[in-house]
């Protein structure tokens, strides 16, 4: 498979693929940019103040505006802003599950406190889940619609419709990205310089995939019902 190297604008916080195009969010330029298949910028639009998180769902992208205190919804591919939702604090991370957004928002920097909440795009209803000590790390939604969140030095799991975590794991740096697929949780922990893979069922034992300087990682595309043989790949030289 042919590789691809792209030149990106400064301060890129998030990279996302949409069809065969690349979407970037920069906290330095405060802009969301869509590139074509040849890395030519097609559209660039302002998106918040020091934005640092986004999620792509079908033909929409949800951006955490961070210091402007809003979640912004843009249509794809024209990046037209179609909705703005003011929320408490500085929204920094977001994950989408159908028409419901799950977000992490920094309420206080000293000491750091993070609000985990859900927002229904259809009704606009806001539902706080938990107020947690520590900085915003990452959030993702599992296949069973439950929440995995990294806040401070902890990784937490919230069952469906619960405001109390049933799993609390420590000894992380500050998790930057989480990705859940087929009962596997991929954990990017750049402060600790590692990427981990963990089953979403007990005994919750993270397996280190990579150690070193690491900005993030994600699952590659694969056929439904299949995942790479992680154990075999870890044994390769």
Where are these regions (language model features)?
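Conserved core beta-strand positions within WD40 beta-propeller blades
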Residues: 21, 60-62, 100, 146, ...
């Amino acid at each position: 498979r042919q590789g691809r190297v792209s030149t990106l604008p400064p301060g890129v916080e998030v990279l996302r693929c949409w069809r065969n195009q690349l979407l970037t969010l920069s906290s330095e330029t405060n802009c969301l940019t869509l590139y074509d298949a040849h890395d030519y910028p097609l559209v660039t639009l302002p998106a918040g103040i020091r934005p640092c998180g986004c999620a792509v769902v079908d033909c929409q992208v949800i951006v955490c505006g961070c210091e402007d205190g809003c979640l912004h919804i843009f249509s794809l591919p024209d990046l037209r802003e179609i909705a703005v939702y003011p929320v408490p604090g500085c929204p920094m991370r977001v994950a989408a599950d159908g028409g419901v957004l799950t977000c992490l928002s920094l309420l206080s920097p000293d000491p750091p406190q993070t609000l985990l909440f859900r927002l229904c795009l259809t009704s606009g209803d806001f539902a706080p889940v938990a107020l947690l000590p520590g900085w915003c790390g990452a959030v993702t939604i599992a296949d069973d619609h439950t929440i995995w969140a990294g806040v401070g030095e902890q990784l937490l799991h919230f069952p469906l419709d619960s405001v109390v975590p049933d799993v609390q794991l420590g000894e992380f740096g500050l998790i930057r990205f989480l990705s859940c697929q087929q009962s596997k949780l991929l954990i990017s922990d750049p402060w600790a310089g590692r990427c981990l893979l963990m089953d979403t069922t007990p005994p919750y034992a993270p397996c280190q995939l990579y150690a070193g300087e690491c900005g993030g990682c994600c699952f590659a595309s694969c056929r439904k019902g299949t995942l790479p043989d992680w154990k075999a790949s870890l044994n390769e030289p």
